[in-house]
Swiss-Prot record:
Segments passing through the bilayer: none
Amino-acid positions noted as binding Zn(2+) 1 in the UniProt annotation, renumbered to this chain: 70, 72, 85, 88
Protein name as it appears in the record: DNA-directed RNA polymerase subunit beta'
Keyword check for Zinc: yes
Source organism (scientific name): Shigella flexneri serotype 5b (strain 8401)
Length: 1407
């Protein structure tokens, strides 16, 4: 018994490990793994089907084919365990050793490992500093390489062709050594002195200045150092021994019909062995050189194919013309080891079936078909049957279950009670795609799902399928109940709003129930309470919509949290009073005293959750659903064709539009408008007509006229079914109703351009053939787009998860004072997102002061919940500095304070929460709702007319920021600064509106002045950019020579003449170096200085500038000297939707990025080249000026002599995030990415909390480049993990040494994922070969910090419930204790074992 125990214990030992190291294997190491050399290419004997000796499946090397039985059958059974049979040489043991025992092949000639040769950059090439082409020519026996030059004039590593080699042999004899093939490369690698080489390179690095050379040297130094530090030897990149995979990992399976299916690896190994044996024989026979050489080359090719088929030359194909799957293919790609078997596994105890509605279920239940339950809970049933003594053995229990005896069903009921199951719907885009429910047994074969969780699963009942999984262990059940139960997931992790919200029928029912109707039956009654209201409705004495007075008792929480009753008479309707009966105590009646649409219901649930907490909300949600379904049925709302009322005015609106179009067509034919203008105008006309039709239609549907009690006519909101569905938010929208009853409108071609003839018909009238044909265009594109979108969105999610997967909350507070300023999002005249929405659930980074005072309103480190936000609003605070994950100081992970509230739970986040994955899911999940298209500007699609003025909407005072201005002759302010912002401040000091004011705008109101709503405060000419003078005086022309630098033009219509400055390309040779300018002088002809500087007022004019002044005229400050025509920038495409989000997270540079000032200083222009201008910025403090070449066609925003600040825009365009980071810092780039991503999502009406985007930005910023190494051991220009630099600097500063200086890097998410510290995580993401090659050469250690690495090695993840386990292990390791292994004595164990063997599977009662 005891040795059986020992034996069992030996079988189940698990390795405790903290890190995984990858390195090159030395030949000795490979031999030490091996259990014998494979010498023959044979696999199994075709007659006996036994493995051949010394073959690829040899039992002597790899172990027995049957458990505890040798091959010849001499020794069988357990008692001979460990004996080696003398007849067939097979050890008697378990078969499963055939999965772990390796063999080896001794190669007759060394071969290069293709990964280190061909995986770019070639490691062998870098190490030897030879080009890859040369190395390949040596390896594949085309040329010789000199290994030892000796006393000759041949250099080491010199490449010799056949002829050169023979010549050298004649000349020098055996003075020198040159070889070909892998032996040559191996000899070269062996004779390298890595440390000396390293020294030499470092010296070179210090001497050289050229950038390319430095780069190359740093690369080599890094590689050499990696070899030195990791203890890898370079010659190990050449294989002399080839390991052979255990046979059960490359199986050979007999098919029926006597054929065999085999793994491709066997073919590849067979090739290697055949060629190797042939080469050995040739060497023994001392065959001619050329034959041996050919055989060696073939061996090299065979080994290449085995390791990575198709990497070099054509892939070796099998019998069916398909390339063979090599070792490298086994691990990479979606079907490879990582993604198929390690990151995703099939699980047992699971089933799947179609889903149907379970409208009678409670929120925490799901209906499980009895058949499925019986199958899924089998082990529990067997155990219970035995425990009850209803079955003596497991076999008997099995029989009972198979016969489905009556008692089995009772047992099943018991087993299932309070045993949660998990329901999952693919695709699982966020964590709410798997939730736990308590099963309720049902007849039939479909799973029943609670309607309210459909939104979270994105499920509908048109044939969707769902999978059921059973959590087996007690811990798993506990986790499922405490964390994954549907009742615990009421709020969405993406935005903190309820995700359990009624939709469709329920909304319609509640809306119908809470509508009011003029002169309904029972109007004007006074009722004693909701009970009476219900009685009257049920007996038919009052209509659901009757306006009545009802006595209502509300309960409100007082300061102590006690409920206080308050009764009053309310004007309401019968339906609302009935609905009040299900509303939990503590909510105000006003919440139901309105027509409830979808938004109102969602708000109602949210309020309930915030005031009363989880349990009442769940009960309330269920009640809402039951009530909604009941009254939707009562309403009898149905759609008939007469509900689609076509407006009478439709016909005349369309004929008016047609007349306008005809007129424009005439203008076009007479040449007054261009084809483009005509197209745009036609589209505008039709878009306007469409809007008018749909407005007329909605007005028509919206109201109906009824007779009230006094016999007068009165308008009321209509009870039209279609209108009710759209108005309540149950189904449909105004746009869809427009297609049913208005006109379908303009259609787009697949390329996105708009067809100029609209579809004037609607679906009620029906479409004619042409209209139908035009419609198919758009419909088909929609379908193609959807398919594309799903794949793209899935890939984006995968990249996001990969970059953020190792980010976990690891401490409570990192103590930083850093943070980001939060202000409301204001675009033009409307607040897109108020401040409270942005700061809710964040932690303040500094004390928030009461505006205008020094009183602290909210102290530092406060989690801002709803009540705090109300306080901020009351005191009209419009900017709050909050903590952010981007500025968090925690080394690995982030702290709870920088993250703030856990959106799905409503309290501050717990330690161990995997915020990275949550962020990735929250951003990726709505990806499928985003559009795929790029918007072309033009047509009605998205035409913003060039703005030429600012008109405010609200009254208040004006506040200008970063403004320079002058006062012109009429006393108005003229703006002379570039990025001026105009804000409208209301009487409480809150920013209501915000506008950008361009250079040259004339302001009607000054800074701080009051304006009324609707007033125009600024205007400008959108088509030209003026040059404004800042001083008064007389104009003097400099270098303005007619015919050389300027030309005169006279306008035909007005007869005014103007001067146009010629572009440098149009000038004569003499005019090339002239710089046309306007100088301002005083009456005596002396220069006038620009106020505040010592520079004369001189304005250089760029090409194409138009001057309408004559030399010597008097001007005053604020006047326009010249105008520069602007090309209309309206033809660029705006990338929108999903591609835009991907571009932002990949940190791609836009095509023509904005040019930003690298330093602060004064702008001037240097010598021009053919196509470029030289921009020079001279700093004021006299340090070195900065020069940049800018293409001539770029429009510059700055004039010569103007002062710019670092990071100012010099030339317009989309800004590149890298530039923002470099010039304006981390916070600016965070703000930029967050705002840009939010813009895309906001357009689609998707709410995502900013935190999630910040989390991804933090991960994009996790690398830094060393600028100056200081006393640290980093290399200059090396890219290192930001946290590593921080830790190193902290240690250096503690020792009083100089830390390293660095600049933060912004990496795109793909790059960032591949650059992670963990090679396992990177390899399982993309480019597996490259990642593993790099890691092996450097001998990398994977500390297993992230989630992915731990999943792959099969451990609990260091997040969630696994966080405690990992913390515990770290504590123990720090204390130097042994890992807690279960200590069992043999006696205890044998007793319990005996019990087990006798009892079978006896579970206990508390299952």
């Amino acid at each position: 018994m005891k040795d059986l125990l020992k034996f069992l214990k030996a079988q189940t030992k698990t390795e405790e490990f903290d890190a995984i190291k990858i390195a090159l294997a030395s030949p000795d190491m490979i031999r030490s793994w091996s259990f014998g050399e494979v010498k023959k290419p044979e696999t199994i004997n075709y007659r006996t089907f036994k493995p051949e000796r010394d073959g690829l499946f040899c039992a002597r090397i790899f172990g027995p084919v049957k458990d505890y039985e040798c091959l010849c059958g001499k020794y069988k059974r357990l008692k001979h365990r460990g004996v080696i049979c003398e007849k067939c040489g097979v050890e008697v043991t378990q078969t499963k050793v055939r999965r772990e025992r390796m063999g080896h092949i001794e190669l007759a000639s060394p071969t290069a490992h293709i990964w280190f040769l061909k995986s770019l950059p070639s490691r062998i090439g870098l190490l030897l500093d030879m080009p890859l082409r040369d190395i390949e020519r040596v390896l594949y026996f085309e040329s010789y390489v000199v290994i030892e030059g000796g006393m000759t004039n041949l250099e080491r590593q010199q490449i010799l062709t056949e002829e050169q080699y023979l010549d050298a042999l004649e000349e020098f004899g055996d003075e020198f050594d040159a070889k070909m093939g892998a032996e040559a490369i191996q000899a070269l690698l062996k004779s390298m002195d890595l440390e000396q080489e390293c020294e030499q390179l470092r010296e070179e690095l210090n001497e050289t200045n050229s950038e390319t050379k430095r780069k190359k040297l740093t690369k080599r130094i890094k590689l050499l150092e990696a070899f030195v530090q990791s203890g890898n030897k370079p010659e190990w990149m050449i294989l002399t021994v080839l390991p052979v995979l255990p046979p059960d990992l490359r199986p050979l399976v007999p098919l029926d019909g006597g054929r065999f299916a085999t793994s491709d690896l066997n073919d590849l190994y067979r090739r290697v062995i055949n060629r190797n044996n042939r080469l050995k024989r040739l060497l023994d026979l001392a065959a001619p050189d050329i034959i041996v050489r050919n055989e060696k080359r073939m061996l090299q090719e065979a080994v290449d194919a085995l390791l990575d088929n198709g990497r070099r030359g054509r892939a070796i194909t099998g019998s069916n013309k398909r390339p063979l799957k090599s070792l490298a293919d086994m691990i990479k790609g979606k079907q490879g080891r990582f993604r198929q078997n390690l990151l995703g596994k099939r699980v047992d105890y699971s089933g799947r079936s179609v889903i149907t509605v379970g409208p009678y279920l409670r929120l925490h239940q799901c209906g499980l078909p009895k058949k499925m339950a019986l199958e899924l809970f089998k082990p529990f049933i067997y155990g219970k049957l035995e425990l009850r003594g209803l079955a003596t053995t497991i076999k008997a229990a099995k029989k009972m279950v198979e016969r489905e005896e009556a008692v089995v069903w009772d047992i099943l009921d018991e087993v299932i009670r309070e045993h949660p199951v998990l329901l999952n719907r693919a695709p699982t885009l966020h964590r709410l795609g798997i939730q736990a429910f308590e099963p309720v047994l049902i007849e039939g074969k479909a799973i029943q799902l609670h309607p309210l969780v459909c939104a979270a699963y994105n499920a509908d009942f048109d044939g969707d399928q769902m999978a059921v999984h059973v959590p087996l262990t007690l811990e798993a059940q506990l986790e499922a109940r405490a964390l994954m139960m549907s009742t615990n997931n009421i709020l969405s992790p993406a935005n903190g709003e309820p995700i359990i919200v009624p939709s469709q029928d329920v909304v319609l029912g509640l809306y119908y129930m809470t509508r009011d109707c003029v002169n309904a039956k029972g109007e004007g009654m006074v009722l004693t309470g909701p009970k009476e209201a219900e009685r009257l409705y049920r007996t038919g004495l009052a209509s659901l919509h009757a306006r009545v007075k009802v006595r209502i008792t509300e309960y409100e929480k007082d300061a102590n949290g006690e409920l206080v009753a308050k009764t009053s008479l309310k004007d309401t309707t019968v339906g609302r009073a009935i609905l009040w009966m299900i509303v939990p105590k503590g909510l105000p009646y006003s919440i139901v005293n309105q027509a409830l649409g979808k938004k109102a219901i969602s708000k109602m649930l949210n309020t309930c959750y915030r005031i009363l907490g989880l349990k009442p909300t769940v009960i309330f949600a269920d009640q809402i659903m039951y009530t909604g379904f009941a009254y939707a049925a009562r309403s009898g709302a149905s759609v008939g064709i007469d509900d689609m009322v076509i407006p009478e005015k439709k016909h005349e609106i369309i004929s008016e539009a047609e007349a306008e179009v005809a007129e424009i067509q005439e203008q076009f034919q007479s040449g007054l408008v261009t084809a483009g203008e005509r197209y745009n105008k036609v589209i505008d006309i039709w878009a306007a007509a469409n809007d008018r039709v749909s407005k007329a239609m909605m007005d028509n549907l919206q109201t109906e006229t009824v007779i009230n009690r006094d016999g007068q006519e009165e308008k009321q909101v209509s009870f039209n079914s279609i209108y009710m569905m759209a108005d309540s938010g149950a189904r449909g929208s105004a746009a869809q109703i427009r297609q049913l009853a208005g006109m379908r409108g303009l259609m787009a071609k697949p390329d996105g351009s708009i067809i100029e003839t609209p579809i004037t018909a609607n679906f009620r009238e029906g479409l004619n053939v042409l209209q139908y044909f035009i419609s198919t265009h758009g419909a088909r594109k929609g379908l193609a787009d959807t398919a594309l979108k799903t794949a793209n969105s899935g890939y984006l999610t995968r990249r996001l998860v990969d970059v953020a997967q190792d980010l976990v909350v690891t401490e409570d507070d990192c103590g930083t004072h850093e943070g980001i300023m939060m202000t409301p999002v204001i675009e033009g005249g409307d607040v897109k997102e108020p401040l409270r929405d942005r700061v809710l659930g964040r932690v303040t980074a500094e004390d928030v002061l009461k505006p205008g005072t020094a009183d602290i309103l909210v102290p530092r480190n406060t989690l801002l919940h709803e009540q705090w936000c109300d306080l901020l609003e009351e005191n009209s605070v419009d900017a709050v500095k909050v903590r952010s994950v981007v500025s968090c100081d925690t080394d690995f992970g982030v702290c709870a304070h920088c993250y703030g509230r856990d959106l799905a739970r409503g309290h501050i986040i717990n330690k161990g929460e995997a915020i990275g994955v949550i962020a990735a899911q929250s951003i990726g999940e709505p990806g499928t709702q985003l559009t795929m298209r790029t918007f072309h500007i033009g047509g009605a699609a998205s035409r913003a007319a060039a703005e030429s003025s600012i008109q405010v909407k609200n009254k208040g005072s004006i506040k200008l920021s970063n403004v320079k201005s002058v006062v012109n002759s009429s006393g108005k302010l003229v703006i002379t600064s570039r990025n001026t912002e105009l804000k409208l401040i209301d009487e409480f000091g809150r920013t209501k509106e915000s506008y950008k004011v361009p250079y040259g705008a004339v302001l009607a109101k000054g800074d701080g002045e009051q304006v009324a709503g609707g007033e125009t405060v600024a205007n400008w000419d959108p088509h030209t950019m003026p040059v404004i003078t800042e001083v008064s005086g007389f104009v003097r022309f400099t270098d303005m020579i007619d015919g050389q630098t300027i030309t005169r033009q006279t306008d035909e219509l007005t007869g005014l003449s103007s001067l146009v400055v010629l572009d440098s390309a149009e000038r004569t040779a003499g005019g090339k170096d002239l710089r046309p300018a306007l100088k301002i002088v005083d009456a005596q002809g002396n220069d006038v200085l620009i106020p505040g500087t010592d520079m004369p007022a001189q304005y250089f004019l760029p090409g194409k500038a138009i001057v309408q002044l004559e030399d010597g005229v008097q001007i005053s400050s604020g006047d326009t000297l010249a105008r520069i025509p602007q090309e209309s920038g309206g033809t660029k495409d705006i990338t929108g939707g999903l591609p835009r989000v991907a571009d932002l997270f990949e940190a791609r540079r836009p095509k023509e990025p904005a040019i930003l000032a690298e330093i602060s200083g004064i702008v001037s222009f240097g010598k021009e080249t053919k196509g470029k201008r030289r921009l020079v910025i001279t700093p004021v403090d006299g340090s070195d000026p900065y020069e940049e070449m800018i293409p001539k066609w770029r429009q510059l925003n700055v004039f010569e002599g103007e002062r710019v600040e670092r990071g100012d825009v010099i030339s317009d365009g989309p800004e590149a995030p890298h530039d923002i980071l470099r010039l304006r810092g981390v916070h600016a780039v965070t703000r930029y990415i967050v705002n840009e991503v939010q813009d895309v999502y906001r357009l689609q009406g998707v709410k995502i909390n900013d935190k999630h985007i910040e989390v991804i930005v933090r991960q994009m910023l996790r690398k830094a480049t060393i600028v100056n190494a200081g006393s640290s051991d980093f290399l200059e220009g090396e890219q290192v993990e930001y946290s590593r630099v921080k830790i190193a600097n902290r240690e250096l500063e503690a020792n009083g040494k100089v830390g390293a200086t660095y600049s933060r890097d912004l990496l795109g998410i793909t790059k960032a994922s591949l650059a992670t510290e963990s090679f396992i995580s990177a390899a399982s993401f993309q480019e597996t070969t490259r990642v593993l090659t790099e890691a092996a050469v450097a001998g990398k250690r994977d500390e297993l910090r992230g989630l992915k690495e731990n999943v792959i090695v099969g451990r609990l993840i260091p997040a969630g419930t696994g966080y405690a386990y990992h913390q515990d292990r770290m504590r123990r390791r720090a204390a130097g204790e042994a890992p807690a292994a279960p200590q069992v004595t043999a006696e205890d164990a044998s007793a319990s074992l005996a019990e087990l063997l006798n009892a079978g599977l006896g579970g206990s009662d508390n299952e």
